[in-house]
Amino acid sequence: MRERILETATSLFVERGYDGVAMREISDACGITKAALYYHFTGKAELLSEIFTAYLDEIAVVVSAGVDGGGSAEAQLRRVVRGMFEVPVERRAILRLAMHDVGSLEAEHRAAFGQAYQKRFIGPLQQLIADGVAQGEFVPKDPELVVWMLLGMLYPFFAPSRGAHATAESGTVDDLLDIFCHGLGRTD
C-alpha cells in the first residue's frame, strides 16, 4: 500500500505541485480513508521527503553508471545525460518538483535532502567536469557553474508536458549535448 500511495502522491504532486494537493485527494485517489493514509505517512511532508529520496536513489544509479563506464569525460557526461533521459518523463519531473517544492520540507528533512542531493547527484557531476578540466578535455571553468548550466539546459525536458518527446533515443538529447559540449559556433 505504501508504494501505491507514493506513486499516487508523486503523480498528483508532479501534476499540481505540492501545495496544490491535499491529503484527502491522495487518499481518495488511492481508494483508502484519510486515516489509512495517515497510518502509512504522518503527513504530506513525509510523503514528499520519501518521493525525493527514492528519486535521488534512482538518479544516483544513473550518474554512477555513466561515470563508471569509463572513457573520456565527455563520453561519461553523455552517458549520464542519456541515462537521465532513459528515465520516464513522469519520473524526471520529480527533479523539477524537488527544485520547486524542497522548501516545503521540514528544516531537518530539507537539510538532509540537500546534503544527499549534493553528495549523490551534484557532487559527482561536478567531479566529472573537474576531471575533464584537469585532463585538458574541457576548458577551465568552475565545475559548480558548469553543472548548474547543464541542469538549466535539462530542466525544461523534465516537465511532463514538454519532455515526453525527449528520450535517450531522440535526436534532442544528442543536440543538447552537442551544444553543451561544443557550443553553437560553426567549426568549418
Predicted segments, located by residue:
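Short coil/turn segments at alpha/beta junctions that flank glycine-rich nucleotide-binding fingerprints
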Residues: 15-19, 70, 91, 135-136
